[in-house]
Amino acid sequence: PQFKLDSGELLENVEIAYTTEGKLSESRDNAILVFHALTGSHMLAGSYQQLDNPDIPWNEELETGWWDGFVGPNKIIDTNRYFVVCANYLGGCYGSTGPSSINNSSNEKYGYDFPSVSFKDIEISQKLLLDYLNVKSLEAVIGPSIGGLMALEFCTIYPEYVNKLISISSGYKLSTLQTLHNLEQAYILDLGRESNNRNNEYLSLARMVAHKTYISLELLSNRAKSETLYDDDLIKGFLSTPQESYMMHQGEKFIERFTPESYLSIIKGWQNFKIEQEDLNKLKDIETLVISVDSDVCFYPDEQKDFLAVLNNHEINTKYTTINSTKGHDSFLLEPELFEDTLKNFL
């Protein structure tokens, strides 16, 4: 169907790739919507094969759902109780309409000409998906990382539709550091457009800029192998340490499973994200949980404390907890056991 974007532009033949886990109750009110992180996907839990997904970029990281440790029968988000929905973002590269889709006016892929998509566009498209799935109301909306920003804004758009909000390693606005990191990555990707088919190398570099905020320095040091993998002639005078090799490897793995055009589309939406503080008053009837990770250097703990203070100023019913982890921002992907009690008790 046709979809009108925040910008006023129209997208034709919009498709949203999604997965569901569990069963919708007869009262249609046991659903949980999960917004994924920047480079995540709708493939939330369980196992996946490239043969079943021939039209999307792929590597072995996609063979297991990105939140498989959290979602499933008798897991933290128990699919014996809940109907869990996760959708790939509009503008993404995992099956939803995005830069890899065909532009009807040219019969070619949109590429970098794909229209600007706001986070609000993504949220509205996912509400349309929930309507299609016949979901009457949501027991919870959950979002880690930038998914937490979308989960929050979703609740301000549809406050009567949501019972609970869970924001994990996220916040309510961009920090100065995030704004600058996004600019750096966008500039790198823009250079890649004019680089004679080297745009994947530029995507790899953009990923390295971001990746160092996803893990703690301690984890980076522990993960880096003792031997180096690269000839130091590649970048003269560099790549002699395992930490450098580790970051190069992360960038190279990433370009197997993502596209520069979708990466730029989503960080552009992030860069232009803004919630007016008065809109937070709409959360009055929504129970809210804010989870911080003490070693997070993407969304720093101080940002969650600021978020909590703003919610308290608006008299929003909010619980707050800090996870103690050495793994940084990516703790929400790697350590379900640390989140288990908090999430189960809140749900």
Residue ranges and their predicted role:
Residues 19, 23, 27-100:
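N-terminal cap/lid subdomain of alpha/beta-hydrolase-fold enzymes
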Residues 109, 113, 120-140:
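Conserved acidic catalytic loop of the alpha/beta-hydrolase fold
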Residues 137-176:
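Conserved hydrolase catalytic core segment
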Residues 305-308, 312-347:
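Catalytic active-site module of serine/aspartate enzymes centered on a nucleophile-bearing elbow/loop
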